[in-house]
Amino acid sequence: AALLILVSCSNQTDNFEYPESNKVPFSEEVHGYVIEDAYRWMEDFTSEDSTDWVERQNNFTQKFIGKNKYKKSIAKNLDEVWDTDSISMPYQVNKKTFYYFNDGSWQQSKLMIKDCDECSERVLLDPNKFSEDGTISLASTSVSNDASLLAFSISDGGSDWRTWKVLDIESGKTLDDRIEWAKFSGASWENDDSGFYYQRYDEPSEELLKD
């Protein structure tokens, strides 16, 4: 599939004009060094310039893909590759084994657990049931040292914002604990499993969330 993509790109690149990315002079001094960054304006992702840039890039991409004569064959090859069982590297915590499994038909892999070496596997967490439309995904997990609790974060609609929850591993029930507005953060359990460390932000303004 990768070879087909490269060939199709070389055949069509000359027929397209890439959207320009404006360079806006900007510099700042950081620890005694002057940093030049002509694309700093892109960091304001809610600005009119940024949203216009994203729209032009998306339009260019869709125009290219739409005219790609290998589109259907590539999609067919990818479906064949993905339509198969897959299992992640298992890991153990306090003699319990955890791993992700997908039979090829699920949108998201399920988190499985074996409570002991001789025990049968069971589904610990099924992110496919988080929402009916499949827009809520499992982002990351962290098992407590005694393997009694699972901290897991979810993402809604592909957002970088994460909501952390805690699952009782034995009962499979989600506890009332809930941490919102986390981003780019893991969960590190205390040695005595009394809690875990994480990073979060203040709740964004409604205006920012709408954008």
Positions of predicted regions on the chain:
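Beta-propeller folds
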Residues: 8-211
